[in-house]
Design a protein with these regions (language model features):
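Intrinsically disordered, low-complexity
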Residues: 1-34, 130-141
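Aromatic- and glycine-rich peptidoglycan recognition patches
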Residues: 18, 61, 77-79, 94-141
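Catalytic cysteine-centered active-site loop
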Residues: 33-84
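Short, well-ordered turn and helix-capping elements at secondary-structure junctions
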Residues: 39, 67, 92-94, 140
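Conserved acidic residues
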Residues: 83-86, 134
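Hydrophobic beta-strand signal
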Residues: 87-89, 105
Length: 141
């Protein structure tokens, strides 16, 4: 059990889709970095939408800057239909006036990679994320 628990954080993620692989190769460079509100590049570190905008941009996909704008720019799909590389959107994670307050990258197995504090993986089956989850969003490639 312990080996499985630790190994989930040590493996080099492999994805079937080359675009998703490029997104995650970039994203994993920042694992463990501090969350910085308004951060949108490696020189500043990242907030949630800054991380997604940067990593998708490196893979050649343009995303808007904020979580709300990214939500508005994606095709909304039920979370159960999410595939690695889709975005996952949340509401009410803090009071900012927007409907959508957080975004992460769906990586499969009901997990996301996001700019939490620190940047890294999160289990989407946890009570916290389930309480705030709105949907997944498919980015047009």
């Amino acid at each position: 059990f312990y080996v499985r628990l630790v190994s989930q954080y040590l493996y080099a993620a492999q994805y079937d889709n080359a675009t998703v692989q490029a997104i995650m190769n970039e994203a994993l460079k920042y694992q463990g970095w501090e969350y910085v509100y308004g951060g949108a590049s490696p020189t500043t570190s990242f907030d949630c939408s800054g991380l997604t905008q940067w990593c998708y941009g490196v893979a050649g996909i343009t995303l808007p800057r904020t979580a709300q704008a990214q939500y508005d720019a994606t095709q909304h799909i039920p979370f159960g239909d999410a595939q690695p590389g889709d975005l996952v959107f949340f509401q009410g994670t803090y009071n900012c006036g927007d409907y959508i307050t957080h975004v992460g990258i769906y990586v499969g197995d009901k997990r996301m990679y996001h700019a939490g504090n620190p940047i890294g993986f999160a289990d989407l089956t946890s009570a916290y994320w389930q309480a705030h989850l709105i949907c997944a969003g498919r980015v047009g490639h």
